[in-house]
Amino acid sequence: MKIVDLLGGQAEYYLNHTCKTIDKQLIHIPGPDMIDKVWMNSDRNIRTLESLQALYGHGRLANTGYVSILPVDQGIEHSAGASFAPNPLYFDPENIIKLAIEGGCNAVASTFGVLGAVARKYAHKIPFIVKLNHNELLTYPNSYDQVMFGTVKEAWNMGAVAVGATIYFGSEQSRRQIVEVSQAFEYAHELGMATILWCYLRNSSFKKDETDYHAAADLTG
């Protein structure tokens, strides 16, 4: 089925939309030269550039400048039972990796447990991104805190090309999270790994009356 058919009546809007707010000359448009155009002149070392190229150069979107990553942190951030009950085969970590490969993803991002269980068999077949920290949901009341579940060296030893981490900006523990993640990413770069930061706002004060300012442009931009 063609994309036009999938989009139906919205095809014209999505496929032919032209942004009038920001001229495209002011942004770095994704393309085959993404590494050379955006990253080559940065302070990233050669090994890290190599890892970035491994991400950008894999899967169906290889060397287009676009990246498709399968993220699965069920079992820690989310209930595996609630997520996988309709498809129990995904309780097996290997099937998560197979899904990413069959889907033509650039990489698969998951936990130490999921990726570590199949690293020897699959780390050379699809780029691994190991998520370093997680919010565990068994503590009550939930504190919106990201806790380190492993080390950068563990991720490197299992053959991962990148590590990722989350920071809950605005939360009570955000300053500690910023320090922990920045130190972890510094070491990851020393080892030649790419890094990915997932950013979320978490503060009850951002909600006032009936308005939720977590999505406000000046907070998310």
Report the location of each language-model feature.
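N-terminal amphipathic alpha-helix/helix-capping segment at the start of soluble metabolic enzymes
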Residues: 1-78, 83, 116-125
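Alpha/beta enzyme core
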Residues: 23-29, 62, 67, 74-221
